Amino acid sequence: MSEREERRFVEIPRESVRLMAESTGLELSDEVAALLAEDVCYRLREATQNSSQFMKHTKRRKLTVEDFNRALRWSSVEAVCGYGSQEALPMRPAREGELYFPEDREVNLVELALATNIPKGCAETAVRVHVSYLDGKGNLAPQGSVPSAVSSLTDDLLKYYHQVTRAVLGDDPQLMKVALQDLQTNSKIGALLPYFVYVVSGVKSVSHDLEQLHRLLQVARSLFRNPHLCLGPYVRCLVGSVLYCVLEPLAASINPLNDHWTLRDGAALLLSHIFWTHGDLVSGLYQHILLSLQKILADPVRPLCCHYGAVVGLHALGWKAVERVLYPHLSTYWTNLQAVLDDYSVSNAQVKADGHKVYGAILVAVERLLKMKAQAAEPNRGGPGGRGCRRLDDLPWDSLLFQESSSGGGAEPSFGSGLPLPPGGAGPEDPSLSVTLADIYRELYAFFGDSLATRFGTGQPAPTAPRPPGDKKEPAAAPDSVRKMPQLTASAIVSPHGDESPRGSGGGGPASASGPAASESRPLPRVHRARGAPRQQGPGTGTRDVFQKSRFAPRGAPHFRFIIAGRQAGRRCRGRLFQTAFPAPYGPSPASRYVQKLPMIGRTSRPARRWALSDYSLYLPL
């Protein structure tokens, strides 16, 4: 009796499971096939029992395919399609005789397409009710019309939506501030979120109006700052609208009087805020933003305003984004930017001004990269913290530059944020992580020169033994292949007594004629060292002075000579190029003598006038 009860259910043999697995390219052992056969039998019995319940609820005695599919859906399993026909499917055996498959009926597509009989609809018979009058009020909607999504909102939400949109896009700034503040704190506007996202996506239609673009970005910023909204499905749409304001050549950017640069800066900051607060809601958001910025930056056909947006966007995302995208592409991009900055034609004036904007944005981004790379490598060198150092000489720059750091790509904060970059932001496969801080600084110094605010050593580390006299340091790059910002240069010819102050009493006396032996026998303390004199050879060697000492130190008192080059302004012509040297007229004089006259350089709106004294000859405007 017990044996009959055990064999009451149908069991699937192991051979059937093994054949099904082999048909898909899998080989199963006997133990695995037995376990799978037992599990399949249990699942089939469960689905059959549930489908029989659906059959009994419909008061039928015949089990249909729809009942079985309902049982599968109830168990969160995909339904079986293709077996809902009322006719029985003919089954044909395979040649081996172990498998059966339904026979496929051949259909002639040509005859089916040219057939004149139109097949009837296979939809099920249903009854639809249309109420013409209810409570004495007529139904104005036509029969069969689909209700719109707006009709699902309440009257209060619709009224709120219209008032907020009118306040944001209106002319009253105080009302706009109140509306934006309410968008940041209101917890009952979740149903209106798709409509506000649609309003923000209208940036493409108002690209000619900077004021409207600013307001739409403020709406997006308010939505992201609202802690009660779930922005997961709408993050990509909002990011696309923000990227449009950052990267695209807006119609308002044609007029040079429109300040579209501020719009791009604000949109870049908003993009950074979106990434750090909602980047975990969308997979691959960081990679998508980086690819968009890299595509714009690598396109030479794009206008310079688009390149400016790409640079500020990378800077806003953090120094790792600058290291990964901007720094490897800088050598290629610099050639096109240099060609724009070297064009002095009148027709290129506006493009050149845009080029200077891009130059400044790149300079700020790479300086941020240098500072963060130094801070990332400093703790592993055992040096003091960056915040506790007050002077550049106290920082262990030489040990950072001349020795490779093992943690140049650690998880460090970006753009003032304490959050690390997600995995894949800057992985080990990035070639920029293998570049040391010294190599980065040398390459950037070859591009920007003294425009870099961060100062590191550009030479080799100080050896223990003295260098031979003929040993020369190779330059970082050829002077013709790089561009440096135009600046006032001063060539300082320093006497052997470089450690004495220029204003000392012995500046031109017999002490200055004593020769190099006197300066070597009586070294003075560091506080009395002149600015133009070299530093002491020691651990601090490698820090570059602004005015480097000449290799051939002449005899005599120190004197300064200023060289100014530029274009003289003219009213009826383009002006002429000039280069003028201004030596000191009366013996040695400090460089501070000309400091009060330097602001005259660059003023072209005022007429040039001569000074009362003849020795002040800095009167040529550039």
From Swiss-Prot:
GO terms for cellular component: extracellular exosome; histone deacetylase complex; nucleoplasm; nucleus; SAGA complex; SLIK (SAGA-like) complex; transcription factor TFIID complex. Gene3D superfamilies: Histone, subunit A, TAF6, C-terminal HEAT repeat domain. The modification Phosphoserine is found at S495, S501. It comes from the Eukaryota. The modification Asymmetric dimethylarginine is found at R555, R561, R593. CDD domains: HFD_TAF6L, TAF6C. The keyword Chloroplast does not apply. InterPro entries: Histone-fold, TAF6, TAF6_C, TAF6_C_sf, TAF_TATA-bd_Histone-like_dom. GO terms for molecular function: DNA binding; protein heterodimerization activity; RNA polymerase II general transcription initiation factor activity; transcription coactivator activity. It is found in: Nucleus. GO terms for biological process: chromatin remodeling; positive regulation of DNA-templated transcription; regulation of DNA repair; regulation of DNA-templated transcription; regulation of RNA splicing; regulation of somatic stem cell population maintenance; regulation of transcription by RNA polymerase II; RNA polymerase II preinitiation complex assembly. Keywords: Methylation, Nucleus, Phosphoprotein, Transcription, Transcription regulation. Residues 511-522 have a biased composition (Low complexity). Belongs to the TAF6 family. The PCAF complex is composed of a number of TBP-associated factors (TAFS), such as TAF5, TAF5L, TAF6, TAF6L, TAF9, TAF10 and TAF12, PCAF, and also PCAF-associated factors (PAFs), such as TADA2L/ADA2, TADA3L/ADA3 and SPT3. Component of the STAGA transcription coactivator-HAT complex, at least composed of SUPT3H, GCN5L2, TAF5L, TAF6L, SUPT7L, TADA3L, TAD1L, TAF10, TAF12, TRRAP and TAF9. This is TAF6-like RNA polymerase II p300/CBP-associated factor-associated factor 65 kDa subunit 6L. The gene is TAF6L.
